Amino acid sequence: VENAELKILSKAKKEKGNIPNKKVKSGLPNISILGTGGTIASFVDYKTGAVSPAITAEQLVNSVSALDEIANVEAEPLFSLASEDMEPEHWEGMAKKSKEIHDKKGHGIVVGHGTDTMAYSAAALSFQLPEVSNPIVFTGAQRSPDRPSSDAHLNLVGAAKVAMTDLGEVAIAMHETTNDENVAIWRGTRVRKAHSSKRDAFVSPNEGPLGIVSENVEMNSKYRSITDETKLESGFENNIALVWSHPALKVEDWESMTSSKKGVVIAGTGLGHIKSNLLDAIGDTAKDVPVAITTQCLGGSTNLNVYRNGRELIGKGAVEAYDMLPETALVKMMWLSKHRADKVSELMGENLVGEISNSRKLD
């Protein structure tokens, strides 16, 4: 009918749905799943094509029926954020909540998290919780749970299995390969997201995974076991700089990025290199605040004794962080500056929670 007028009589309301109360099954272990947002808790809006947070921790847990077969699962909503919006205060919140769950419930913990900054958060919890009475396992998804190709279900079930072991440290559990077969377990301080979209996006330079999850969890590397009590030292000094060495870096750039900072991490090229004309400026900075040097490379380690510039950096007060990933080195210095302010330079080169590998040798 031409020129007909359409009137909206009412608008449909989006049903959230009631989450049924699950019966506790005797004989099954108990775990908690912390919801923090990310793709694993998102749906695709097919009108816009964009992915956005859309489901709660409870809905995520109830969407994966396989979890009911292996554990009694409690959902613990914490916040709902894209991982690029995570800040140090959120790291602190996750650590405190994990400590609370360990102390009050004795549960292993799975943290649902966006993958982009998952490695930062895993490192942050590793330093804040150096001893844990139950595992803390981060997991996420490269593709949202509503997509047929989603990796969310396998990752979540794999992480839950790890949360029921005697792993006494913070870890990440994500797809080992692009196939829906196994989940790899990565140490929280030795892991990087190395691919923007593939399922097997995570790697651990110089080490490889701590273990693999298939039907069972098989640990293939040395790991720390759970302790009687979870130890918490939460909080960070945020005023730390991370500077990447590159050919266009100038003295004025260095001064702009590091002035008023309480510490600096340099991601050097190769063995820990940075331009010769920056050495004096770095030395001036190192007189006042800690300066640590790691490498941008995903294999090998720093060695400042090989070339003249490296030896000069040591002489000017910089310290080596060896094969610590730059992002982990940043988090470590932020944590040390809050809790061990008088020993930052000394401790940056020491292996506290597995952040420095045992294979930092020159090939």
How would you name each of these model-derived features?
Residues 1-12, 21-23, 271-363:
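C-terminal non-catalytic interaction/assembly regions of soluble proteins
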Residues 34, 56-57, 62-67, 184-273, ...:
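Accessory alpha-helical/coil subdomains and C-terminal extensions
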Residues 35-41, 113-119, 178, 269-273, ...:
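Gly/Ser/Thr-rich loops at beta-strand to alpha-helix junctions
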Residues 103-118, 259-271:
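Short acidic, glycine-rich surface-loop motifs adjacent to enzyme active sites
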Residues 139-214:
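Internal gly/pro-rich beta-alpha loop/helix module
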